[in-house]
Amino acid sequence: MASQGTKRSYEQMETDGERQNATEIRASVGKMIDGIGRFYIQMCTELKLSDYEGRLIQNSLTIERMVLSAFDERRNRYLEEHPSAGKDPKKTGGPIYKRVDGKWMRELVLYDKEEIRRIWRQANNGDDATAGLTHMMIWHSNLNDTTYQRTRALVRTGMDPRMCSLMQGSTLPRRSGAAGAAVKGVGTMVMELIRMIKRGINDRNFWRGENGRKTRGAYERMCNILKGKFQTAAQRAMMDQVRESRNPGNAEIEDLIFLARSALILRGSVAHKSCLPACVYGPAVASGYNFEKEGYSLVGIDPFKLLQNSQVYSLIRPNENPAHKSQLVWMACNSAAFEDLRLLSFIRGTKVSPRGKLSTRGVQIASNENMDTMESSTLELRSRYWAIRTRSGGNTNQQRASAGQISVQPAFSVQRNLPFDKSTIMAAFTGNTEGRTSDMRAEIIRMMEGAKPEEVSFRGRGVFELSDEKATNPIVPSFDMSNEGSYFFGDNAEEYDN
């Protein structure tokens, strides 16, 4: 990106650091991972989990959720002020699964939030360690991104289900800070803004008074985050217009939807981070590995190496395919829900299938599901190669006025062609140039029309052998052009919010 110099790296966002050099960043990210690992070990002790039970991803999710809820200040305040029957605002908990007499049993545990906060701080040298909390939020968000399709949410805000590749991070909580904002897709930001504008249309006082001033500040901040994701001057100019609007209304919603559509070809820059479940970090720390000393990065080989040597298990429902469950979690661990499946198959070394072809539901088990028929199996999270993560959106030339990877939001900096029928997307723009911004719109449409689908993104970039830690010998994969590489496209995956 042109303004890269003014931006902090992901790792700095991840660790709230001021400018640091690469070694310091690796150390501070490592420190964050150490903290999560130590916390997880302590929780497994508290809950008396066996080694196997501690490596069960469902237990990991419950423990992660408990600490996130213990630190959710706003919700905790809300619960104190609006007591609801049967919910103790001071407690947090969830299902913990244990192996008893050859069967999996569900046990509901309840802890004081204060106690959980104490254990977390103790594991993090007395700090609140917000970066570690955000890291877990992003892991949950990546898991949601691979598990559910957000068609319904898209349609509700007046967007098109075809925009699902723009929805990264759509389930991240608002409190996820700079690191969270970095991984949100263009569609996610547009949706948050549209919801805000709609509230303003329906509620006369939304922008007024003391509260309205804060609201307005939040609105402009969100506009700036979205503007920073766009890589062409015309898209950014339209964002300025949306931000400066005296009284945001339907015209702004129209502009935002137009911008979201344009991002299908002129991709935004969206960060990708490998955030792994706590049950991966825990055993690594327990085995004596020192992440802070060794250094760790979320965007290089480190997560691949860690997964290569990790044992993680999952509960499996009677009619689920363990290999498919593994693919789901593998994609989440590599934040690759919107990456090209041809590329993922190459990196993983086994075929990666679209969501609708997978015989698996989500990783979480609902409280009313029957445990008697539950089995467990090992998740296969290893990869054949590793690749460097990207946030560029895959646009092919330096002015960025070119085809990004259409219908995919690239997660890896690896050469690929653009396998998608551009005319389908362009059809969404025909005849819709009225409105105040027609000059900018015309400019954006012109750039999109000039985007050549036969171009190659990330030219010359390749994947690497796992033994090639310094990334010296790129292997540039060759792909079958005829295959379209999107995971959700034309798919019937389960909805996140049904």
Curated annotation (Swiss-Prot):
Coiled coil (UniProt feature): none
Keywords of this entry: Capsid protein, Helical capsid protein, Host nucleus, Host-virus interaction, Ribonucleoprotein, RNA-binding, Viral nucleoprotein, Viral penetration into host nucleus, Virion, Virus entry into host cell
Positions of short motif Unconventional nuclear localization signal: 1-18
The name this protein goes by in its record: Nucleoprotein
Primary residence: virion
Entries under InterPro entries matching the protein: Flu_NP
PTM characteristics: Late in virus-infected cells, may be cleaved from a 56-kDa protein to a 53-kDa protein by a cellular caspase. This cleavage might be a marker for the onset of apoptosis in infected cells or have a specific function in virus host interaction.
Gene Ontology CC annotations of this record: helical viral capsid; host cell; host cell nucleus; ribonucleoprotein complex; viral nucleocapsid
Function description: Encapsidates the negative strand viral RNA, protecting it from nucleases. The encapsidated genomic RNA is termed the ribonucleoprotein (RNP) and serves as template for transcription and replication. The RNP needs to be localized in the host nucleus to start an infectious cycle, but is too large to diffuse through the nuclear pore complex. NP comprises at least 2 nuclear localization signals that are responsible for the active RNP import into the nucleus through cellular importin alpha/beta pathway.
Biased composition (Basic and acidic residues): 8-21
Region (Disordered): 1-21
Subunit (UniProt): Homomultimerizes to form the nucleocapsid. May bind host exportin-1/XPO1. Binds to viral genomic RNA. Protein-RNA contacts are mediated by a combination of electrostatic interactions between positively charged residues and the phosphate backbone and planar interactions between aromatic side chains and bases.
Tagged with keyword RNA-binding: yes
Gene name for this UniProt entry: NP
Biological process, per Gene Ontology: symbiont entry into host cell; viral penetration into host nucleus
